[in-house]
Amino acid sequence: MNARVIRVVVVSGSLRAPSRTHGLLQALVERLPAVLPKLEVHWVRIAELSASLAGSLERDSASADLQPHLQAIEQADLLLVGSPVYRASYTGLFKHLFDLVDHQSLKGVPVVLAATGGSERHALMIDHQLRPLFAFFQAHTLPYGLYASVESFDDQRLADPAQFERIERVLDTVGAFFHIPVARAA
């Protein structure tokens, strides 16, 4: 079987680099080949694009360095998106990035939602903020989200075994979406 290459776009909504949000998404990306053996990964890091985003009020006037990232999002086969929790929501520039995305381009695209925060009390941000944002785009948000608090990290790297188990559940849903059987150790 000659499977097609899956275009994966990872959006890290943190305003800092390095960040725990990037660490969580990186842990997911590192395990993704277990279910998607042929993939292309494109990273969109808000921390690196903040000046371009802040200066782009409309899609037509978006800066030249921002355009390839917007096009990658609009052409993605799979989105992995994450943001730190700021005042019970995602970062403003994360939202602004998606304000510039064509509102019809994500219809039916699977999206893995992820967030990081100071404590577990912010975990509902995934369902109360991120999921409705992608519902607007008519994207297919996968049922398991990833939320990790400060205790799950060693510096900026994910270190909590329970989080790696959650990533495995997320990967199962990704594999199911693309009709790829997931082989697990007994």
Swiss-Prot record:
InterPro entries: Flavoprotein-like_sf, FMN_Rdtase-like_dom, FMN_Rdtase_MsuE-like, NAD(P)H-dep_FMN_reductase. Its EC number is 1.5.1.38. SUPFAM superfamilies: Flavoproteins (SSF52218). It is an enzyme of class 1 (oxidoreductase). The keyword Transmembrane helix does not apply. It comes from the Bacteria. It catalyses: FMNH2 + NADP(+) = FMN + NADPH + 2 H(+). Keywords: Flavoprotein, FMN, NADP, Oxidoreductase. Pfam families: FMN_red. GO terms for molecular function: FMN reductase (NADPH) activity; oxidoreductase activity, acting on NAD(P)H, quinone or similar compound as acceptor. PANTHER family: FMN REDUCTASE (NADPH). Belongs to the SsuE family. This is FMN reductase (NADPH). It comes from Pseudomonas putida (strain ATCC 47054 / DSM 6125 / CFBP 8728 / NCIMB 11950 / KT2440). The lineage of its organism: Bacteria, Pseudomonadati, Pseudomonadota, Gammaproteobacteria, Pseudomonadales.
